[in-house]
């Protein structure tokens, strides 16, 4: 039984030699033969090259300093199998072996991890999502359409009372989900304890009056797992049901510690992820990265969206959406995809079409809701109307003729600058 990692290698030298070196260095080998590296030992734990698929040569090196004075830059996808006996199901061991010293090997001008296939031994080895798609929809009371969410803006600087005033306006707008910006955790001007105490009475009062409980995701991340757990408990004990976790900041250990004790929906923000992926010739594909966090138990996963304000192209978002929506072992291990970043109703039709005509997502709009010319309530209605049009295959411009909120949204945001 093996774990198969696919590396996209770029080198002016031999692809085969690089593949063999990765397999050796990341399992039993070192720079010279050593006593004890027997054939029996290697048969149990040595990695093996399974296959090499040649790709078009690179036009320019990912790491230019490595390629000086060399010839063609050969590229190939290389599948390497690592025996489960060498790794087990520990995710820190898997990350160490999959990445480890690979990026420091001499002779390559680039390397990227583009796929990972886990054996059935990982099924049940980690908790996975506690709520996921079904739980998120149940707790928000949303069926047959996306969960519509927004973000407290300004992202930083509001005091708890000021935040609660804004939240009061947002929950009356008809929105399903509100979150702290990922940068907001527990600063001196807005301690989490005070923010929870100011916001949750508004949420609960609205629920009592209307029967609808808006899901609010509080930022609870902390480098100290015990402190993060105390933050979690503050939210849970006040009647909250969701938390923002900055997964790269808290790490595998922090996420594992939290998930095993959590009673909250865990909304994963991947800030810092771009360090690992923005260079197309190095780093790691999201298809690989997301598997770790899903096994650890994130319930909702932010993955950007269509025509975002950041660098990521639409094709990358579509691939990410497909990745988180594809079961690792069972449909219950899929988190809810979260489309965000510069979103408003204008991206709804393309999002719907390109993600397989699904409404199983959280559609997160900041300025696209709160900056609507007629206020947040009109902003929410405009996004809902856009999704109604998308699902019915009606062009937005046509639907807007009878829906003034959508019409005003198109007028403000269609140039791509407003949201």
Swiss-Prot record:
Pfam families associated with the record: RuBisCO_large (PF00016), RuBisCO_large_N (PF02788)
Cofactor: Mg(2+)
Positions of modified residues (N6-carboxylysine): 179
Annotated residues for binding of Mg(2+): 179, 181-182
Top enzyme class: lyase
Family: Belongs to the RuBisCO large chain family.
Protein name: 3-oxo-isoapionate-4-phosphate decarboxylase
Lineage: Bacteria, Pseudomonadati, Pseudomonadota, Alphaproteobacteria, Hyphomicrobiales
